């Protein structure tokens, strides 16, 4: 018996060790994949208004897969003219600093400031500070919409903190939050110290919304009003700022564009922080406590759009169902924009327009923008399908 028990323990230990090795290798492979170079995004940009381009302080190779995609897809003058029916005011600026662009948080932040100076970012009327997801991904749709509405007169800046998907980057939230706080604080100081007439906006989606909100809360404790507005999309549970905004300040949570439009039509001003969370987004509702306790949203008489009225809570089962739903939440078809679950693509144009103060956009321009965003996404998917070098 003792020999058999010892053999079982040894087998269990071996399986556990092997699983750990396999998981570690898998994570390393994912990270390596997010540093790889794609065929369609292999050539450094020539423009002096994006990172990795002419005169840039950031090397193109250090941007990683997500950064290279972002800087190579800045909206061009012809597209702005075709969509908006007006000439470009200025070329849009896209600044991206990768995890390999500089070794420390402080150096990455300073590199971002230097890069904004070199690319002309501080000469734009708006700067959007994007809080990336775990891989370094910044939602291209939101940024392109912003560039179209601004007729190019906008700069976007983002600093990468990791190379793994959001579900594998939860241990990076604290680091990402501190990085975002440092960037926001440094930008606010630079704008104020130089008397620049620039509106500073925050943007984050999913894990980027969580870390971005934590960063805003952190820098707000050091002074008041670090930003001029924010758009937070699909915020996961656990954000202290989200709780403060909704429970203490009464900031509304919007499920869809029509709700935001109705809110404004009622005479309300645009919230300092515009919150977009779908009623049926599993990412915004998943909690560890759902394993043993019914969440509040299931107790509500009106569960909201897209939530099945017959959905029930069962101990343990609901937790794993939520985990599966969260994992599958980002499954989408390129160009077919949805407004459900964790797919916010159909909502973004309207929310960007209102949250960032683009009051000079008419219905035709909005319609054209939404069509262009779909076209761009289809082309992007074709580019990505070409594969890696």
Feature roles, as predicted:
Residues 1-198, 218-389:
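C-terminal His-loop and adjacent cap/lid subdomain of alpha/beta-hydrolase
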Residues 209-221:
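Short glycine-enriched nucleophile-adjacent loop
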